Structures are given as structure tokens and as C-alpha cells.
Amino acid sequence: MEIKTNRLCIRRVNRSDVLHIRELNKNDNVNDFFGSVPEADRAEAFRDSNAVEKLFTLMESNLDTDNDIFYGAWKNDTLMGFIAIVNPTSHTPGIQIEIAPAYHHKGYGYEFLSAILKHLFETESFTYIQYLVMPTNAASIALVEKVGGALQKPGSFIEKLLIRVYHITK
């Protein structure tokens, strides 16, 4: 499966992609970068100093399973982001997106997410996807709302403080 957009080539991430990305990030630059970002601005997943390596390990371990599906978006042979479909066979599959900082605020996230949603709804027979976002992540909230995500009423006060749940339907 390969999806071409105006600026991107999108496909499932394979083992050699993960190994290549891991090799590119083998030095401590990426972990150093996350260490230099103020803790309040770092996503929970990246508060650990080895978060990037753990992410690659998770991606690699799930490549041959139905647990999660990873899609990458390449621009001119450079991986600019990935999308993970979490629990794709469940009744409440989730979606997560990461875009490299150099591509922020240029429409790449929308282009990538829109293409993947179209693929999931039209080709993979998905009818519903859940998108979780921190209330302070304005860019992610704007992105999910732009693709038609509907904010769900929080189930608890704690949920209201910590997370926003959006539903994206076909």
C-alpha cells in the first residue's frame, strides 16, 4: 500500500525503516533534545531519557502483529512523520500522530492525517477512530477539529483536566 499526496509518499512502516531511523538517531542528539525541552512542554511519553529508543522498540515489536499499525510519511525520501493506529481490530481503535518539528505549521500533519483517514475509512473498512489529545496541545486539537473530529463529553472531572477525547467517523 502506498498513498501519494501532493507532497508526501505514505506507506506502512517496515522493519528496515525502523532500523534506518534507529541508526540515524543512534547518537544522543534526539534524547538530548528531549532533555532540553522544559518538562511541562514534553509529552508524557518523552519524559524518559530513553523515550526515543523505547518508541523504536515498540514500533519494531509490533510490526508483525495486529496490535498497532504504523504508517510513515516521506517527503523527498525523508521521513517527516508517522501515524500509529492503536488497537486496530478493537471496537475503539485509536490514532496517534507525530510530525517532525521542521514540518510543523506547514499543513503536512493535515495532509498526512487526511490521507490516512481516507485510506482507513474507504479501504480498511474502519467506521470510527478515537483521537486522544492533551488539553494544552492546541496544534493537535486544531488538527483533529480540521479533519472533523467531534469532542466527546468528559467521563469525569479528572478526564476533563488531563485529556480530550475526539471521535472521528467516516
Language model features with spans:
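GNAT-family acyltransferases
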Residues: 1-101, 160-170
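Conserved acetyl-CoA-binding loop-helix of GNAT-fold acetyltransferases
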Residues: 105-119, 138-146
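Small side chains
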Residues: 72-73, 109, 149
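Conserved catalytic-core motifs of GNAT/GCN5-like acyltransferases
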Residues: 132, 148-165
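Structural motif
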Residues: 28-29, 124, 148
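Conserved beta-strand-loop-alpha-helix junction that forms the acyl-donor binding cleft
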Residues: 100, 131-141
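Conserved GNAT acetyl-CoA-binding A-motif
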Residues: 122-132
